[in-house]
């Protein structure tokens, strides 16, 4: 099974074990993100600017990449540094930045539950760009696996967790603010489609870029996160008056920033040595971690929809990565 098909890079057991451990760590960090953010709340709200968290996360990624090159964890390319190859990463940073900001604006035109369910369409858009841009064909089994993955995400978003104090299943945020009627405006639908397309394009474009360039991963990340820091610094500065960069931060928030930075680096390795499809499975499997941590830390109840979503994810993994 090749890397492009979603297989494990390399045949040796040590490398396979490292790859598996990396995917498990990434899944755990993805799943822990929302529960850790919930633990940061003070009086029911986030005490810091979201742009501050994003900027500090990008800055942490940049510093870790620079450190890995300086101490020799990854070799610096011989000869003149290929700075011209940095330019294409500006588009990656722009796509990721647009995607992150669209998430915020989408909440104005639809309720959280509708967003959580319909945003799973980005799985389909990623698969579409994966086939068009990377010229990989998905088998019928793989296509069915991705459909099951979309269904699992929608099922979990619609009712995987429930606040014991309410009778309305759904995402914790939706349950806590109920009753909010399900709704989406025409503009919201257009923005959601745009969000899903940009999400798929950004993932596949970055994968294509990282695989075509014969540069160390740390140097490619250095290019990507340099543009990311500049972009998010501009967004933070242009966001108007508000809390300072470090105002409202706590130990929990520092853990969120560090875990997201490390997860970003792990995902870049998946994009270079694995595929965008592998990333989709990591994100989907993280729903299980998210639910278990939410139940343990936030005292939310798991519902039948959670177990159905878990079953669908397991079937999807078996179909996509199982023997053909």
Swiss-Prot record:
The gene is SLC35A4. SUPFAM superfamilies: Multidrug resistance efflux transporter EmrE (SSF103481). GO terms for cellular component: Golgi apparatus; Golgi membrane. GO terms for biological process: transmembrane transport. Mediates the transport of CDP-ribitol. Does not exhibit CMP-sialic acid, UDP-galactose and UDP-N-acetylglucosamine transport activity. Keywords: Golgi apparatus, Membrane, Sugar transport, Transmembrane, Transmembrane helix, Transport. It comes from Bos taurus (Bovine). This is Probable UDP-sugar transporter protein SLC35A4. It is a multi-pass membrane protein. The chain crosses the membrane at residues 19-39, 53-73, 86-106, 142-162, 181-201, 215-235, 249-271, 276-298. It catalyses: CDP-L-ribitol(in) + CDP(out) = CDP-L-ribitol(out) + CDP(in). Belongs to the nucleotide-sugar transporter family. SLC35A subfamily. Found in a complex with SLC35A2 and SLC35A3. It comes from the Eukaryota. It is found in: Golgi apparatus membrane.
């Amino acid at each position: 099974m090749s890397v492009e098909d979603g297989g494990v890079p390399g045949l040796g057991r040590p490398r396979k074990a490292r790859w598996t451990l990396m995917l498990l760590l990434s899944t755990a960090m993805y799943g822990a993100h929302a529960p850790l953010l919930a633990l940061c709340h003070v009086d029911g709200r986030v005490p810091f600017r979201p742009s501050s968290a994003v900027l500090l996360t990008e800055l942490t990624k940049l510093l870790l990449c620079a450190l890995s090159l300086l101490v020799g964890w990854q070799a610096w390319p011989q000869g003149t540094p290929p700075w011209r190859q940095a330019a294409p990463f500006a588009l990656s940073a722009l796509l990721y930045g647009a995607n992150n900001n669209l998430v915020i604006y989408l909440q104005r035109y639809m309720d959280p539950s509708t967003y959580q369910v319909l945003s799973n369409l980005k799985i389909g858009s990623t698969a579409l760009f994966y086939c068009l841009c990377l010229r990989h064909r998905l088998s019928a089994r793989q296509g069915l696996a991705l459909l099951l993955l979309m269904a699992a995400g929608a099922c979990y978003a619609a009712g995987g967790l429930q606040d014991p104090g309410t009778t309305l299943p759904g995402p914790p945020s939706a349950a806590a603010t109920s009753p909010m009627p399900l709704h989406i405006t025409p503009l919201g639908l257009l923005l959601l489609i745009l969000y899903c397309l940009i999400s798929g394009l950004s993932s596949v474009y970055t994968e294509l870029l990282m695989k075509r360039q014969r540069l160390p991963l740390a140097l490619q990340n250095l290019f990507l996160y340099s543009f990311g820091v500049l972009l998010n610094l501009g967004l933070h500065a242009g966001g108007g008056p508000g809390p300072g960069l470090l105002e409202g931060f706590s130990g929990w928030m520092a853990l969120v920033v560090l875990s997201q930075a490390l997860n970003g680096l792990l995902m870049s390795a998946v994009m270079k040595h694995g595929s965008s499809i592998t990333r989709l499975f990591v994100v989907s499997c993280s729903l299980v971690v998210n639910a278990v941590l939410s139940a343990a830390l936030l005292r939310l109840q798991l519902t039948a929809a959670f177990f159905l979503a878990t079953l669908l994810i397991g079937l999807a993994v078996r179909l996509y990565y199982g023997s053909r």
